[in-house]
């Protein structure tokens, strides 16, 4: 497996290459084959988001408001020391990274000042990127959204290896997420759902020329609780489902469905055909422990995590709290299991599902973990030495180890030898049978 890890402490990018079963917390277990630090820029310039492009390039968004176009080149792994006598080092390629272009000034802390200046209890809010997503593959157009409510449309010129800003928009801040709707084929518009602290979910539409942005829908808060207190608003993540297809479908109304989790441990299910309030709004945890992320599991999921089903009952989902838990729930909000229970010791600051089968997790305890979402078993655990902010899986290929290759060759030779011996035994038995038949005929005569 080959992954890229954003490490907050040094503002670096780490390439980690390993096989299934790797565990750095156990000395006798399999160890990672390669861990190397790249593009280190310090704590104030850590990497928020990573987006892999189609031609061996990456978009890397940093906390200082700079987006970098990074070129990756695969080169054979070089070793600085000789292998132990009678052994060989494994042979594989590693990446060399080079920044080829940048765009700066894409964040604005001043837009967040009104949200905390009037309160003595609030900490200062720092702007950061909440999404970097491919918008139009044919045109190489990407959308970037920030916590301060800035939405940028940029173009990747693959021939010149250049980044160009096409347009910028402003929406209500703060944003904890901005999720693109990608569940239909060709569309003449782009739909985005966003929200955050005291910022109810809103759906916006960007036209195909990227010249206009308008709000098309806004959620409404649920009714007050049993003490007639306002239910706090803080959606932290959203995933779309396919449009509603039931008998009550009204064709003249917009038709979108999505699910959310909130900072206050609420699960929300929304259908715009139903109205502005959620279809369901449930407490997930008894003490309303803060939740921070959302990933959905379904039979089919798009590359950016939206569920290719119109039924809420077809999905399960994974979320994280601010303590140490990675939690898996069914569609009704019933807790199914905790990933890494007893193993994760710090806040899980990042999770993502990759290739529809791997759960990648990292956080304050500085360990990269990979789980199989079908068996829920841990595949790998690797210490990277810094708080993890983002993880992306490049490939899940296993590296063949020389010792393993030799064992396989020995097993093949043994298997061939057994087959030859079996054939020789069969031949001997055949001749013996023929001799027996001849002898029997002669005795009769």
From Swiss-Prot:
Q: Does the keyword Nucleus apply?
A: yes
Chief place of localization? nucleus
GO cellular component labels:
nucleolus; preribosome, large subunit precursor
Compartments, record wording:
Nucleus, Nucleolus
Q: Name one GO biological process term.
A: rRNA processing
Keyword list (alphabetical) reads:
Nucleus, Ribosome biogenesis, rRNA processing
Record-linked CDD domains:
Nsa1 (cd22858)
Role description: Involved in the biogenesis of the 60S ribosomal subunit.
Family per record: Belongs to the NSA1 family.
| Subunit details | Component of the pre-66S ribosomal particle.
Q: Report the protein name in the record.
A: Ribosome biogenesis protein NSA1
What is the species listed in this Swiss-Prot or TrEMBL entry? Vanderwaltozyma polyspora (strain ATCC 22028 / DSM 70294 / BCRC 21397 / CBS 2163 / NBRC 10782 / NRRL Y-8283 / UCD 57-17) (Kluyveromyces polysporus)
């Amino acid at each position: 497996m080959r992954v890229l890890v954003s490490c907050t402490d040094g503002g670096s990018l780490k390439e980690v290459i390993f096989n299934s079963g790797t565990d750095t917390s156990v000395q006798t277990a399999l160890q990672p084959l390669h861990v190397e630090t790249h593009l280190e820029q310090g704590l104030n310039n850590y990497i928020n988001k990573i987006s892999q492009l189609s031609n061996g390039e990456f978009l890397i968004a940093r906390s200082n408001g700079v987006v970098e176009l990074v070129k990756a080149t695969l080169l054979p792994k070089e070793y600085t020391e000789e292998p132990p006598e009678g052994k060989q080092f494994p042979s594989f390629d590693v990446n060399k990274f080079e920044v080829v272009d940048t765009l700066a000034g894409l964040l604005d802390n001043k837009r967040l000042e009104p949200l905390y200046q009037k309160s003595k209890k609030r900490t200062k809010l720092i702007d950061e990127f909440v999404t970097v997503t491919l918008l139009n593959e044919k045109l190489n157009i990407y959308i970037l959204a920030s916590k301060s409510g800035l939405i940028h449309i940029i173009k990747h010129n693959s021939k010149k290896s250049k980044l160009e800003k096409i347009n910028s928009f402003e929406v209500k801040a703060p944003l904890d997420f901005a999720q693109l709707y990608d569940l239909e084929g060709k569309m003449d518009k782009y739909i985005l759902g966003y929200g955050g602290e005291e910022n109810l979910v809103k759906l916006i539409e960007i036209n195909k020329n990227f010249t206009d942005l308008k709000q098309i829908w806004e959620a409404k808060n649920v009714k007050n609780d049993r003490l007639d207190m306002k239910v706090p608003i803080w959606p932290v993540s959203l995933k779309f489902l396919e449009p509603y297809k039931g008998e009550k479908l009204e064709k003249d109304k917009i038709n979108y469905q999505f699910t959310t989790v909130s900072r206050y441990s609420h699960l929300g299910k929304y259908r715009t055909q139903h109205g502005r309030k959620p279809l369901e709004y449930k407490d997930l945890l008894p003490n309303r422990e803060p939740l921070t992320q959302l990933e959905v599991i379904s039979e089919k999921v798009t590359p950016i995590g939206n569920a290719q089903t119109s039924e809420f009952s077809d999905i399960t989902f994974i979320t994280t709290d601010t303590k140490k838990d990675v939690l898996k729930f069914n569609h009704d909000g019933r807790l199914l299991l905790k990933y890494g229970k007893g193993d994760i010791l710090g806040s899980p600051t990042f999770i993502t599902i990759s290739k529809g089968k791997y759960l990648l997790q990292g956080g304050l305890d500085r360990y990269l973990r990979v789980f199989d979402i079908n068996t829920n078993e841990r595949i790998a655990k690797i210490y990277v030495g810094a708080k993890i902010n983002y993880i992306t899986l490049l490939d899940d290929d296993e590296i063949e180890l020389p010792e393993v290759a030799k064992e396989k060759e020995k097993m093949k030779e043994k298997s061939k030898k057994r087959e030859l011996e079996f054939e020789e035994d069969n031949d001997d038995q055949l001749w013996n049978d023929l001799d027996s038949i001849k002898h029997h005929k002669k005795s009769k005569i």
